[in-house]
Amino acid sequence: MLSNSSQVILRNSDYFQHQDVLILNYEADTLGLSLLAHAKSVTALALDFNHYLQLAAKEQPQLACFFGHTLPSSFAGKTFDSVIVFFPKAKSLAPYLFELAANHLNIDGQLMIVGDNKGGIKSVAKLIPDCFSAPVKRDNARHCLLYTCQLERQGRDFKLENWLSQYSLSTPQGEIIICNLVGVFSEKHLDLGTELLLSHLPKLEGRVLDFGCGAGVITVALLKAMPKLELECIDINAMALASCELTLQANKLQAKVYPSDGLTQVTGAFDAIISNPPFHDGLTSTTDIATQFVAMSEKQLKSKGIWQIVANRHLPYASTIAQVFGNFDVPAENNKFKLYACRKK
């Protein structure tokens, strides 16, 4: 099953005949495989680990798939005939992807941008670097828009630091430095949920997991308070993981940072799991994911292991936590968030 955006790309497959094609911000389907009927080769970069896993299972000699915020170093200087960019949900990420595209596109090569027509893509002309020609709308179907333009001249060298903001953050554990790449959630002050969590941290020791680490706020606060922790940080988003690693470096701290689709890539048992899980909108699908997170995280805890999360108070966590863990406490709450704490039997 192809997403609407991917279906629009396939409608325009004549553009890719016998070409080497790069896809940036790859979505969760098998478009890469379908394009091989037209293109010479397809290389895909997924920023979401779940999206990567779906295509990685289909890899073959002319189809390569990678996860990360950039292509591997072996692709430095490698250029393609066409680059497809899936317009990101975080609009601030779009110029980053366009500059990355420019660094991997032949001069006069084609950039294709596709996205939901209500997802911000209509502002593409304001976001494209001036090394490209003006984008032209080529298709409007499946509630999506497709734009194309050409690389007229070489753009500036791609440097990650051009897309990084760094700032100090006051936490209950003291001042910390946060490194935030575009597209990663940031308020440049401690959000109310994380503040509630950090203000009521239990004493921890041993192996601890920060689920949905984002830019590393909770990670660094934990290590500031308890530097002997064996901390592991997971997220599904490549920009978040890169931000977390940079945040750790800036604070001269160390932790294991790696991608995981939920808790699927996590191995072994933990003494504690601490999280401000990224499930906020209250949709049925989100509630289901949150429910799965509770059940799976209990299985990753050692006996007597500590589990503590902060969540929007309207999300129905309580019944699931009671069902999975039995008893639980609410050490603190405010008008927006609740802190849930329990210990595995």
UniProtKB/Swiss-Prot annotation:
Its EC number is 2.1.1.172. The keyword Cytoplasm applies. Pfam families: MTS, MTS_N. One of its GO terms (molecular function) is 16S rRNA (guanine(1207)-N(2))-methyltransferase activity. Keywords: Cytoplasm, Methyltransferase, rRNA processing, S-adenosyl-L-methionine, Transferase. GO terms for cellular component: cytoplasm. It is found in: Cytoplasm. Belongs to the methyltransferase superfamily. RsmC family. Monomer. Specifically methylates the guanine in position 1207 of 16S rRNA in the 30S particle. This is Ribosomal RNA small subunit methyltransferase C.
